[in-house]
Amino acid sequence: MITLPQSLGTKLDVPLPVAIQPHYNLLERAPFENELRPIVEASDMGVLPYYGLAAGFLTGKYRSAADTENSERLSMISDYVNDAGFSLVDELVSIAAEIGAKPGTVALAWLRTRPTVTAPIAGASSVAQVEGLLASTTLELTEQHRQRLDSASDLFAASR
């Protein structure tokens, strides 16, 4: 996938790709981490993950299946609506409360700690949401917080 543009660029002596934009977040890790990250690391490319907040699921807005019933985003988050998905959100909410941040801010700060990630991509529909996104650029998570999020993420992956 990424190797074709790399090899063609080298063969044709044209500029090589410098970044990719994968689907990557606490709920969607394996495809990027297992397949793409090794190529990105070898090619010294940047990573700009999209859906960093999993279509809003990682903001703490959805804490139970009942919270998702009338959501216009249900089709985008339906894979996450299960006990393991809600447990991950509970862990995000818990860490956010401990450090005085919003869950979405914590989720994006976690992404920033990942190898090769240059900057996560997340959308906002209000000024308040923009403030949370900006706060993620300076929020530093402790190793314990990262481990707790990794564990919750691993439990979610195992539930699929």
Task: Give residue spans per PLM region.
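Conserved histidine-centered catalytic loops in small-molecule metabolism enzymes
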Residues: 158-160
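Beta/alpha (TIM)-barrel catalytic core signal, keyed to glycine-rich beta->alpha loops juxtaposed to Asp/Glu
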Residues: 1-151, 156
